[in-house]
Amino acid sequence: MTTNKTAKIQFYEGTDEPVVPEIRLTRSKDGTTGQALFLFEKPQALSSITDGEITGMRMIDSEGEILTREVKVKFVDGEPIFLEAVYIWKNTPDFDRFMRFANSYAKSNGLGYSEKK
């Protein structure tokens, strides 16, 4: 099921993930490289109603799609509870593009952004 949000995340093509993740960013000292860690607790993508294999995480907005294949499932007491995805950028244009997605995703989901001091 696709929503009318301007920015969304999908693990299965055409199916928006309704669970909003915790997102943590880290960057190199010069700011050119870094990563975004997405942590989804009990995402719909792991529920029994979803079928198929998760092959990546798609970040979709009005500019297009950013894809990462770095996706892991974390189990607690034998149950899949967390989905963890990592997006790595290797240059400033990739970081700028990611931040435009992140800002759009935040607005679509009523979220804010704060820097660690």
Swiss-Prot record:
One Pfam family of this chain: Psb28
Keyword Nuclease: no
Principal subcellular localisation of the protein: membrane
GO cellular component: photosystem II oxygen evolving complex; plasma membrane-derived thylakoid membrane
InterPro entries the record matches: Psb28_c1_sf, PSII_Psb28_class-1
GO biological process, one term: photosynthesis
Topology term for the membrane: Peripheral membrane protein
Subunit description: Part of the photosystem II complex.
Stated family: Belongs to the Psb28 family.
Protein name: Photosystem II reaction center Psb28 protein
Encoding gene per record: psb28
